[in-house]
Amino acid sequence: MRFYDTASAEVRDFVPLIPGKVSLYYCGATVQGLPHVGHIRSAIAFDQLTRWLEYRGFRVTVVRNVTDIDDKILAKSALSFEPDFEEGPDDVREEEWWALAYRYEQAFLKAYDTLGVSRPTYEPRATGHIPEMHALIQGLIDRGHAYPALDDSGDVYFDVRSWNRYGSLTRQKIDDMQGAPDADPRGKKDPRDFALWKGHKEGEPTTASWVSPWGTGRPGWHLECSAMVTKYLGTEFDIHGGGLDLRFPHHENEMAQSQAAGHAFANFWMHNGMVTYQGEKMSKSIGNTVSPAEMLELASPRVVRYYLGQAQYRSVLDYQPTSLQEAAAAVERIDGFIARAVRTLSGSVVSGAAELLFSSHGTVPDAFAAAMDDDLNVPQALAALHDTVRAGNTALTAGDNSAARTALHSVTDMLRVLGLNDVAAPARDEQADTALGVLVEAQLGARAQARATKDWAASDAIRDTLAAAGVVVEDGPDGASWSLKRG
């Protein structure tokens, strides 16, 4: 198994620190707005990684943080106390910063759940880990890598020139970097020094401040992740992930402050690529954005998940007007085979279907396994999936039920690894499934009789009635088969 490590800029063999166990941290959301496709693509990429590691037999501990205190959250909350230009005084939403953060956190969780992103082992909030952050800051001060601001602001800064490996993650020299944007330049030794602790400023809510040895204030963004990952995964762990846009300054600063504190920190750094809109960077200002919610208005959750997870995680994923249609067609081909195979192999619509669909058989094809072991090469893995679907359909047509069953087991296992087996699947009622099957089979029996007597009008009428109800009928050499139309 080999993954690309951003820090070494090469694909390396992955060997976990503890045999049989993997520790993974990936950056979650700063909950100051609704999720965008970049957030969701990143979550799906690391969900695929987790599922593959688990399939390979590893016990995976996953930590995904929630940044629930930040400059952007405070700014957004302050704006929410004033009416929008389209709203009247009665429509003003008075919302405290913590309430705003919680509301958007729930929106992220809903999006993750809808698109089949597994819940992490731990999902810590920054505001719940202030003591750990204080301890990390004090340790950096004691080691000579941090200092209280040279004015009365109450800030504490990381001294980038005290750490000779600063810039190594992104292969930059300090003198070529711009000044850190996350704090005012006053009180700094170097404009590139970044804030570990931000002193309380006039006009900020007192509820967004905590007492510290350096004055009342709140943590810096970069410090939050270092403190939380260390608490849950220790000072050395296997994989740190996130979007490519977080590589600098966020991950560069995380690595510097953690290693300067004496922590080995991450063994691998993995970054997923961005999502573009018809070849251009998405931007609200020019109106070329598409949100997960908008995608879900156009396609089912499984189709959206297929689209957002179909590219190799490090590559750019480009959104085109036809992207979801193409993903829907691919999902339809997969589901068509599954429906056909279940009907043939289970002996009825429901009986035996659960064993066929929901049991893990450990039978992914060698080509699929080789692709996933090769830095999560999902495009090649999907090619193996569709090859298996074609082989399964061929086996069904030939009446080779043994080969068809093997193909079905392989397909369901591959879908499970890719997170496509049960994305936002509605609860199934076995009695309802049985009743539906009996009714549809009765209609198909009547249609077969009509066709036998060449009553084509009656045959077409039955087919049209079933189609209107969402039942797709396909005629084959062994008679008619049916499946439910997918969203």
Curated annotation (Swiss-Prot):
| Superkingdom, natural source | Bacteria
The cellular location(s) given in this protein's UniProt record come to:
Cytoplasm
- Give the residue ranges of motif 'KMSKS' region: 281-285
Q: Which amino acid positions bind Zn(2+), per UniProt?
A: 27, 225, 250, 254
Q: Which cofactor does it need?
A: Zn(2+)
State the residue spans of region: Disordered.
Answer: 174-194
Mind listing the UniProt keywords for this protein, alphabetically? Aminoacyl-tRNA synthetase, ATP-binding, Cytoplasm, Ligase, Metal-binding, Nucleotide-binding, Protein biosynthesis, Zinc
A GO molecular-function descriptor: zinc ion binding
Which cysteine pairs are covalently linked by disulfides here? none
Transferase among keywords: no
Q: Name one GO biological process term.
A: cysteinyl-tRNA aminoacylation
**Chain residues that bind ATP:** 284
List all Basic and acidic residues biased stretches.
Answer: 183-194
The yes or no answer to whether the keyword Cytoplasm is present is yes
Q: How is the cofactor bound?
A: Binds 1 zinc ion per subunit.
| Quaternary state and interactors | Monomer.
UniProt-listed PANTHER family: CYSTEINE--TRNA LIGASE, CYSTEINYL-TRNA SYNTHETASE
Q: Tell me the protein family, please.
A: Belongs to the class-I aminoacyl-tRNA synthetase family.
The protein's name: Cysteine--tRNA ligase
Organism, per UniProt? Arthrobacter sp. (strain FB24)
